[in-house]
UniProtKB/Swiss-Prot annotation:
Function: The UvrABC repair system catalyzes the recognition and processing of DNA lesions. UvrC both incises the 5' and 3' sides of the lesion. The N-terminal half is responsible for the 3' incision and the C-terminal half is responsible for the 5' incision.
GO BP term (any one): SOS response
A Pfam cross-reference name: GIY-YIG
PANTHER family: UVRABC SYSTEM PROTEIN C (PTHR30562:SF1), UVRC/OXIDOREDUCTASE (PTHR30562)
Name of encoding gene: uvrC
CDD domains on file: GIY-YIG_UvrC_Cho
Record's keyword terms, sorted: Cytoplasm, DNA damage, DNA excision, DNA repair, Excision nuclease, SOS response
Main location: cytoplasm
Protein name: UvrABC system protein C
Length: 581
């Protein structure tokens, strides 16, 4: 990729945290060259247009595509980046030799579970994380033990104790080993800890806050300060673990699916977790099932995708595929199908949906248009066209496409000044649209892109109107016949099968159709009105329609203009005037 290609691709990326991947090759032969994280994907990727090192410059030169995935937080991006580097081992990433993983919190699979911070969770454990700040995690685990008394000793020590250990004396363990607390009560305390990691911060934050306030009232300021710091760690920890998947129930691998429908196609985003850690993500495109919604997308995707792939232990979706055969097949393969309504899994499903709905990839037409033009992703595009009959009865159309689909409730049309000047008519049409937008008289959202039906002259006229009114929206034109895409800076001659060209052609053709339809409506109005005028036969009526186009134009015509039409003398002209007054 050269610098211009990098800038074009960067312009299509969202201003959100996430990870980006420079890749070589396409489709099944893609090789990941480099993985990076970003607080702002667009700005970070744009910086690669001017790489600071020779190594990265070579990487950019070899790359053919740039893929990405959005995350909710910068921390999630950091964790996903680390796991993608581990999985793909990209040649241009610098990897630590010990290749250590991030800390996790586990509740062991035991009737009296222990809680601990670990990088290597035990089989069957309920795992939370990963987290980036080990010190903060340890502070939270200690606070949980102080509040609920969960043990931290090994199973061997637990089974061989005959009296409470020092942890009991320190108040961080309730000594279930010697029966100081019953298993049922201990299980309730363990459940409270689970609720904290599943998102109920208050089970720990609320008692800490009460203790802090009491210490402050008793002027125990040092203790109050310590409790304040501990409370801060407890509340901050949830900002790190949003992508964690609980491993309770023996689920070592989990696929989280999010689906979105975009016109005639559907996008499915898959997030893959292993051992509680998000380690992979991808997006897939398929035809959208007719009238079935996203449940139909899941029903089509699951059997196709997993037919020749290893099934995970669990699949989470935003909604069930509503197909008993699929559910029976998954059950027979030992796969749990779930639709989480709340908690950490539901948060991860939301993230999968966010990735599915995220435009700007290489699969959608508007995303490719953004790539090709180097602009922000144009989810909302308005098209403009002018139609007239020999300079008379000029009308303008303004159509709207949202996510590549016509939004007919946002179509508008306008009668234009009667003059045989395409540029002036386009300038008037755009001035009307822009003025209404700037003055707040148009209830439609501002578009991301304007498409002008015409060539350089029409585009220039439109841009004049935009500059005059101060409406800051990018505009391009699609020229007829040669199908050239014209921007203020250059002219694009794309291949006939280019997806981005197909999108512009659909918008241009729809704007033209809507303008012609409106013009025909006005002509029909003229025809209907002229039917009642004595002395006007079918042929004369056709000549009037071709010459004037609208009732207003006929009404405004002079005697000389009317009598210039074959079949209309002075008396007929006077009759026309009388009937149209």
């Amino acid at each position: 990729m050269d610098a211009d290609e990098v800038r074009e691709r960067a312009g299509s990326l969202p201003r959100e945290p996430g990870v980006y991947l420079f890749e070589q090759g396409r489709d099944d032969k893609r090789r990941v060259l480099y993985v990076g994280k970003a607080v702002d994907l667009r700005d970070r990727v744009r910086s690669y247009a001017d790489p600071r090192s020779e190594r990265i410059a070579k990487m950019v030169e070899r790359a053919e595509t740039i893929d990405f995935a959005v995350t909710d937080t910068e921390t999630q991006a950091l964790l996903l980046e680390a796991n993608l580097i581990k999985r793909h081992r990209p040649p241009y990433n610098v990897r630590l030799k010990d290749d250590k993983s991030y800390p996790l919190v586990q509740l062991t699979d035991h009737p009296v579970p222990r809680i601990e911070v670990t990088r290597d969770p035990a089989d069957g454990a309920t795992v939370y994380g990963p987290f980036t700040d080990k010190g903060r995690v340890e502070t939270v685990v200690k606070a949980l033990r102080e509040a609920y008394g969960l043990r931290g000793c090994s199973d061997h020590k637990y089974s061989n104790r005959d009296r409470p250990c020092l942890d009991y004396e320190m108040g961080i363990c309730t000594a279930p080993c010697t029966g100081e607390i019953g298993e049922a009560d201990y299980a309730e305390d363990a459940e409270a800890v689970t609720r904290y990691f599943e998102g109920e911060t208050g089970v720990l934050a609320d008692p800490l806050r009460r203790e802090m306030e009491a210490a402050a009232q008793n002027q125990e300021f040092e203790r109050a300060a310590n409790l304040r710091d501990k409370l801060g760690a407890v509340e901050a920890l949830h900002g790190e673990g949003d992508t964690a998947v609980s491993d309770s129930g023996g689920y070592q691998t989990t696929d989280v699916l999010g689906a979105a429908i975009e016109g005639e196609r559907a996008i499915v985003a898959r997030l893959h977790a292993e051992g509680g850690k998000l380690v992979e993500r991808d997006r897939h495109t398929l035809e959208a099932p007719d009238g079935e919604g996203t449940a139909g997308v899941y029903r089509a995707f699951i059997p196709q995708y997993y037919a020749e792939r290893e099934l995970p232990d669990r699949i989470l979706c935003a909604e069930a595929p509503a197909d008993p055969d699929i559910e029976a097949w998954l059950e027979s393969e030992g796969v749990t199908l779930g639709v989480p309504g709340a908690g950490r899994e539901a948060t991860l499903v939301d993230l999968a949906l966010k990735n599915a709905r995220q435009r700007g990839g290489t699969d959608d037409e508007s995303g490719r248009l953004a790539d090709a033009l180097g602009i922000d992703h144009p989810s909302r595009i308005e098209g403009f066209d002018v139609s007239h009959a020999q300079g008379r009865s000029a009308v303008g159309s303004n159509v709207t496409f949202v996510d590549e689909t016509p939004e007919k409730s946002d179509y508008r049309r306008k009668k234009l000044t009667e003059q045989n000047d395409d540029y002036a008519n386009m300038r008037e049409l755009l001035r009307w649209r822009a003025t209404r937008a700037v003055e707040g008289r148009d209830d439609r959202p501002d578009p991301d892109l304007l498409l002008i039906d015409g060539g350089d002259g029409q585009l220039g006229a439109a841009r004049d109107a935009l500059a005059e009114t101060g409406w800051d929206v990018p505009a391009i034109a699609l020229a007829k016949d040669e199908e050239l895409v014209i921007t203020p800076d250059r002219v694009y001659d794309w291949n006939d099968d280019a997806p981005q060209l197909h999108l512009l052609q659909r918008i241009r053709d729809e704007a033209h159709r809507f303008a012609v339809q409106y013009h025909q409506t006005l002509r029909d109005e003229v025809s209907t009105t002229l039917d009642d005028v004595p002395g006007i036969g079918p042929e004369t009526r056709k000549r009037l329609l071709r010459r004037f186009g609208s009732v207003d134009s006929v009404r405004a015509a002079s005697d000389e203009e009317l009598t210039a039409i074959d079949g209309i003398g002075e008396q007929t002209a006077e009759t026309i005037r009388t009937r149209l007054q």
